[in-house]
Amino acid sequence: MGQVIAISSGKGGTGKTTLCAAVGSCLAAEGKRVLCIDADMGLRNLDISLGMADLAPISFTDVLCQRNSLRDATPHPEIQNLYLLSAPALERPESIHHQQFGAMLEAAREQFDYCMIDSPAGIGAGFRLAVEFADRVILVAVPDPASLRDAAGTADRLDRKSVV
């Protein structure tokens, strides 16, 4: 059974997308099957960080709406075992049904060793979607007062939800 790991931050620009791409790539290079999901709807960049700019036409909402399956996730052109589901460009996080997203992640646990979710910044609906079904959350911050305050607030919310 695979693990779902969300990479999150209370603030933008902390490096969560870069970390998600790097950890996913390293795990895949070790022979693990890895699915990276960009959950930053409207501001997706995980494809760029993975060196797959505009090469991942399948979004996670395509899977949720059953237009595609997890097996259709875009394979990385150079790194074996690494796959990407991009974020939809026009969807709003509030329009995504959490239970459908959770069911997709449960299916991903069966097909992949790791599912890495690149969460949007902040604590809004996109953040809640990304972390609700995660086994673990990696919280990213940079050493400045605003980032540290936002990280503390985000950690508090995660702690209240019992997501570590």
Regions found by a protein language model. Name each.
Residues 27, 31, 50, 158:
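Active-site catalytic pocket residues across diverse enzymes, especially alpha/beta-hydrolases
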Residues 22, 45, 161-162:
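Asparagine-centered polar/low-complexity signal
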Residues 6, 84-86, 116, 138:
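Structural motif
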Residues 2-39:
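Walker A/P-loop phosphate-binding motif and the immediately C-terminal alpha-helix
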Residues 36-110:
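P-loop/Walker-type NTP enzyme "switch/lid" segment
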Residues 1-3, 30-33, 79-81, 111-112, ...:
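Short coil/turn connectors at secondary-structure junctions
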Residues 12, 39-42, 88-90, 121-122, ...:
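Short, ordered loop/turn segments at secondary-structure junctions
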Residues 99, 103, 107-110, 114-164:
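Conserved catalytic-core segment of NTP-binding enzymes
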